[in-house]
């Protein structure tokens, strides 16, 4: 996993400690424990948590792009959102589907 610098890039001057915790602890330590949980699975969990909390903003879009880069296909993403909709709420699912459609827009259609 490449070194995360988003915290420092976006908040470093305003909230240096938060930026440090974001980049060094959350992404530097937690996300890097691939022997415990793969990046793909961490992406899946993160998206479901964001969806469940109704957090549909640029940070969710980042995590959907991250999930795609970590190997979650368009079809899998659709199934993840559909499954989570019954637990996280239908309106949340609609919002996440629209964001996922943007991220996966240039993918080839699935072959039947």
Task: Provide a role label for each language-model segment.
Residues 2, 47, 61-62, 75, ...:
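Aromatic-enriched hydrophobic runs in primary sequence
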Residues 41-50, 60, 80-81:
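Short, structured motif recognition centered on aromatic/hydrophobic residues
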Residues 51, 83-90:
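A short structural micro-motif
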Residues 60-83, 95-98, 102-103:
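A cross-kingdom feature marking solvent-exposed beta-strand/loop segments within repeated
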Residues 1-41, 52, 69, 93-112:
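Acidic, glycine/proline-rich low-complexity segments that act as flexible tails and inter-domain linkers
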């Amino acid at each position: 996993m490449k070194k995360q610098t988003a915290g420092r890039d976006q908040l470093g001057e305003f909230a240096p400690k938060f930026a440090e915790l974001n980049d060094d602890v959350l992404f530097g330590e937690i996300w890097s424990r691939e022997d415990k949980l793969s990046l793909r699975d961490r992406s899946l969990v993160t998206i479901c948590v964001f969806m469940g909390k109704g957090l549909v903003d640029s940070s969710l879009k980042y995590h959907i792009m991250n999930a795609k880069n970590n190997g979650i296909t368009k079809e899998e993403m659709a199934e993840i959102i559909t499954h989570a909709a019954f637990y996280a709420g239908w309106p949340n699912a609609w919002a996440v589907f629209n964001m996922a459609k943007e991220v996966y827009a240039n993918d080839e259609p699935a072959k039947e």
